[in-house]
Each structure stands twice: as structure tokens, then as C-alpha cells.
Swiss-Prot record:
It is found in: Cytoplasm. It is an enzyme of class 5 (isomerase). PROSITE patterns: P_GLUCOSE_ISOMERASE_1, P_GLUCOSE_ISOMERASE_2, P_GLUCOSE_ISOMERASE_3. GO terms for biological process: gluconeogenesis; glucose 6-phosphate metabolic process; glycolytic process. Keywords: Cytoplasm, Gluconeogenesis, Glycolysis, Isomerase. This is Glucose-6-phosphate isomerase. GO terms for cellular component: cytosol.
């Protein structure tokens, strides 16, 4: 029988609390680097944990802890359609957007959910072909060259991360057919800037809102409608597509749009990049060939994540290491650095994925817990960050574990040789140097020049940042977050913390009398500017 116990009630966690971290200065060897390396999806995308502060003793306890907490069994419950999201009484079905792994999942005793997601994807493929061929044109008969996605949170961050990761790869392979843009913030300057930078006559718009009444998305959609009308595009709906729930206000009220692609309430926004939320824009911009590779990489990782052996399951191992670092070593943040400009938006998606999922203070049964949960997730792009916050990481008083991401080859295949090495070789050399410097440090009698080392890191790497690779990496982090939530005994699939601010904002906008003196005082400072 599957048990749902708090982390501090698990016997093997109590054992783990007494285990000191490995000393990287002496432990990090060529042999260790070779041995502490596994593939994320069973093929070409690797997770190397040689520079983590763990050894074989930790790995043994990790295995026992995973078994005791029934982590793989809980993952199987997700795949088989159990209502894991207990606070909202919902299933968690994002894995089904990339393939059938568990049992058939039937919703409301009639609809096969894998077939539902696949049928929506086929609709996207067919729609994109019609757009690319010119059979579907703009109101003024122009062929669409641009796609603008309007949405916020999971309706923007994940899709934007995938778009920027793949854009140059698609260009190099002559698969970049349309330009993608995103509008998320309710700040009208963002909408104005994006819409003024493109030819509206050649632009298709995707409106994404699961509920259909997201404040920011509704406001930005109205901004768009006003802009289109003022530019002579009166039949604006002929340039709009909608992604939402079947019975949402958006689906019911905004009739007559070009096409409707449907989400399902079993998939939260942060887990939705491989649903219509992310794949509609990606298919339009880069063709279904690219999208199928993303799905393939994610699906293979999903399958390999079923492996009970911790040393062969990268997301599971990464989750256990994360719990050890947060709850035993007391490291409060995790920095994600991709040595690839194309992945500049990826850590922003991971911020939401991890912090919205596991930033909780009650367990699955709505009981307050007395141990740490999620770490602060932040990051950037190497080598830029070496000249900004790496000083703090090397010599600051806080130890911050890092995830490095790197690739052997570039996407565009253009480079230059200077000082006997290419720019890409310099990029990779800096990545390697940082891992070693953080691990081993460098002793100096001058304390200002002394580097203590013992800064742990993991390395995710592959030959090239391909659609397949980004799909595998995306799934790796999604499953890692899921396993962390299981260990912490929390519900990783709701987000009540988002709601309070929304409620207060609506009260402020509607309450002209300002009966609350705190609201009144702030409103006079910011809204009224008295």
C-alpha cells in the first residue's frame, strides 16, 4: 500500500540527516566524473552529478528513501489517472500529451484522454499546414508571417522558453516559417511595443487562458482588439485563435475565431508546454517536424523516469539530491546556468515550475509542516553571469548549488578562430572551468583571493541543443519537481498562493470609496497620485 508520510517521518530521511556531505576537493576525480553520469532519456542527453556533495553511502540511502516513500509507485498513480491533485480533486495528465505510458485514462466515463490530447495536436498540425500553404490568410488577404501569443504564467513562460531554445536550430534547418512573439504583462507598454514592431496585416494571434477570464490576458486581448480596429482590421476574429477549456467564458463568448484548441483542467499551466498551450505556436513557427521531436524527447524521459533504481533515473536522483541540499545541508536556493544563449528564458520557466509547484507550507492533508520545502530558483546565461553574480557564488557567505547546462556544438554552425580557439571552445572551456573552480576552489594566504570551493553543481549536457534534447530536459525538470513534491508530501499541482493577490487587486479596482485605510493610503500614493 502506498504511504503518504511527511518527510521528517520517513526513517531513511532521519538517517540521511546524519550523513555529512562529500568533500569535493578530494573526491572529484576523472573516474568519478565518468561513473557519476547517467542519461536522462536513455540515449544522448546526460545528467552528471560528479560535482555534487554525495558518495555511494548517500546513494544507498537515497535508494532506501525512494523505496520507503513509494516514489515510483506515486508516479505510476499519476500516469494511471489517479486524482493526485487532491485539493482540486483533479487528475494530473500532462504526461499524456506526449504519449501513453500508463493505463487508459477515461474522463467522465466516456472520453479517452490520450485520444483527446492527440486529436487536439492533429488539429494544430492541420491548422498550421493551412496557414503555411496560404489557404488561411489575414483579413486583408496577406499571408501570415508572425504569431503573437497572449497569455501569462504557464501560458507564456514555458512556450517562450521552448521557442527561444529552438529558434536558431529551426532557422539552420530551414524550418523557421513564422516569427513568434509573446505578450504577458498587463503593463500596456509591453503590448504597445510588441504590436508596433510587427505588421498587423501579417500577424496571427493566439489567446491563451485556461479559465477564460484571466485578468491580464483579458485586458491584453482588449488592447489587441482596439489596436486591430484602429488599424482598419474590423473583422479581427479572423486573425485570432483561442486556447482554453471547452466550456470557458472565452470559448463560449468569443465565437467566430479562426480556430479553437482545447486544454483540459487536469493540466496546470506550468506543466502545459507540451499541450496546445505550447505546441500551437511552435508548430506554426517551426512545423510539426520540430514539435514531434520535442514530444519524443519528453516521452522517452517520462518512460525512463519509471526506473526504480535511483542511479539510473536522473529526475529521481536530482530530486533526492535537492531534498538533501535543502533539508539537510540547508542550502536555500538553486542557480540554473545554461551556457547557451538560446536557453536564456529557460530558467524563468523553471522558476515557475518549481516554486509554484512546491512553494507550500501544508502537506497533502492540509496540515502545517515543520520542514523546508522549495528552494529559490534563479539563474542566467553563461558566460554573461560570470561577470555579474558569480562573485557571490564563489566567495559569498551562502553556498548555492548550481545546475549547469551545456552543449558540444552550436545551433547556427558559424564561428571564428581567435587566439587558436573558436568562440564555442571558449564557451565550453569557461563552463568546465567554473565547475572545477566551484568544486575545488583555490587556497591562497591572502584571504581576499582565497576560494573555499565545496560549491556543488550538476551538469546536464548533450551534443547539441536540438528539439529532442530540449524535450528531454523539459521532462527531466518536470519529473524532478514531481518527485520532490512526493518526498515533501505536498500537493505540487495547485497554486492557492496566486489567488489572494488577484482578489485584493479586484477589490482595489472596484472600491472607489476605499473603506480600508491601508488600501486607501497605497492607492493615493500609486493609483491617484494625490
Amino acid at each position: 500500500m502506498i504511504n503518504y508520510k511527511n518527510l521528517n517521518e520517513l526513517e531513511n530521511f532521519k538517517i540521511l540527516e546524519g550523513i555529512a556531505p562529500e568533500v569535493l576537493k578530494t573526491a572529484l576525480t576523472g573516474k568519478r566524473i565518468k561513473e557519476y553520469d547517467i542519461t536522462i532519456e536513455g540515449d544522448s542527453v546526460h545528467y552528471n552529478y560528479a560535482s555534487k556533495q554525495i558518495n555511494e553511502n548517500h546513494l544507498k540511502i537515497f535508494q532506501n528513501l525512494s523505496d520507503e516513500a513509494n516514489l515510483i509507485e506515486k508516479y505510476k498513480e499519476v500516469l494511471n489517472g489517479e486524482k493526485i491533485n487532491i485539493s482540486e480533486n483533479r487528475k494530473v495528465l500532462h504526461h499524456l500529451t506526449r504519449g501513453q505510458i500508463g493505463k487508459d485514462v477515461i474522463e467522465d466515463n466516456k472520453e479517452n484522454m490520450r485520444e483527446f490530447f492527440q486529436s487536439e495536436l492533429e488539429k494544430i498540425y492541420n491548422f498550421a499546414k493551412q496557414v503555411h500553404s496560404g489557404n488561411i490568410k489575414s483579413v486583408n488577404g496577406k499571408k501570415f508571417k508572425n504569431v503573437v501569443q497572449i497569455g501569462i504564467g504557464g501560458s507564456s513562460l514555458g512556450p517562450k522558453a521552448l521557442y527561444s531554445s529552438i529558434k536558431n536550430y529551426a532557422k539552420k534547418h530551414n524550418l523557421a516559417l513564422m516569427n513568434g512573439y509573446f505578450i504577458s504583462n498587463i503593463d500596456p507598454d509591453e503590448s504597445e511595443e510588441v504590436l508596433n514592431s510587427i505588421n498587423l496585416d501579417e500577424t496571427l494571434f493566439i489567446i491563451v487562458s485556461k479559465s477564460g477570464n484571466t485578468l491580464e490576458t483579458t485586458a491584453n486581448m482588449q488592447f489587441l482588439i482596439n489596436k486591430l480596429k484602429s488599424n482598419g482590421i474590423k473583422e479581427y476574429k479572423k486573425q485570432m485563435t483561442i486556447i482554453t477549456l471547452k466550456n470557458s467564458m472565452l470559448a463560449l463568448e468569443e465565437t467566430g475565431c479562426l480556430e479553437y484548441f482545447f486544454m483540459h483542467d487536469s493540466i496546470g499551466g506550468r506543466f502545459s508546454p507540451t499541450s496546445a498551450v505550447g505546441l500551437a505556436l511552435l508548430t506554426l513557427c517551426f512545423t510539426e517536424k520540430i514539435v514531434k521531436e520535442i514530444i519524443k524527447g519528453a516521452n522517452k524521459t517520462d518512460k525512463k523516469s519509471l526506473n526504480k533504481k535511483v542511479k539510473d533515473n536522473a529526475p529521481l536522483l536530482a530530486a533526492l539530491i535537492s531534498i538533501y541540499e535543502r533539508n539537510v545541508l540547508n542550502y536555500s536556493s538553486n542557480c540554473i546556468i545554461a551556457y547557451s544563449k538560446a536557453m536564456e528564458n529557460f530558467y524563468l520557466h523553471l522558476q515557475q515550475l518549481e516554486m509554484e509547484s512546491n512553494g507550500k507550507s501544508v502537506n497533502r492533508f492540509n496540515e502545517t509542516i515543520n520542514y523546508k520545502t522549495v528552494r529559490i530558483i534563479w539563474g542566467g546565461v553563461g558566460t554573461d553571469v560570470q561577470h555579474s553574480f558569480f562573485q557571490m557564488l564563489h566567495q559569498g557567505t551562502d553556498i548555492v548549488p548550481m545546475d549547469f547546462i551545456g552543449f558540444n556544438a552550436t545551433q547556427l554552425k558559424e564561428d571564428v578562430i581567435s587566439d587558436n580557439s573558436s568562440s564555442n571552445d571558449k564557451l565550453k572551456a569557461n563552463l568546465i572551468a567554473q565547475i572545477i573552480a566551484f568544486s575545488k576552489g583555490k587556497e591562497n594566504s591572502n584571504k581576499n583571493k582565497n576560494f573555499k570551493g565545496e560549491r556543488p553543481s550538476a551538469l546536464i549536457y548533450s551534443k547539441e541543443l536540438t528539439p529532442y534534447a530540449i524535450g528531454a530536459i523539459l521532462s527531466h525538470y518536470e519529473n524532478k519537481v514531481m518527485f520532490e513534491g512526493f518526498l515533501l508530501n505536498i500537493n505540487s499541482f495547485d497554486q492557492e498562493g496566486v489567488q489572494l493577490g488577484k482578489i485584493l487587486a479586484n477589490q482595489i479596482l472596484k472600491n472607489n470609496a476605499f473603506e480600508d485605510e491601508v488600501i486607501e493610503s497605497y492607492s493615493k500614493k500609486i493609483l491617484k497620485q494625490d
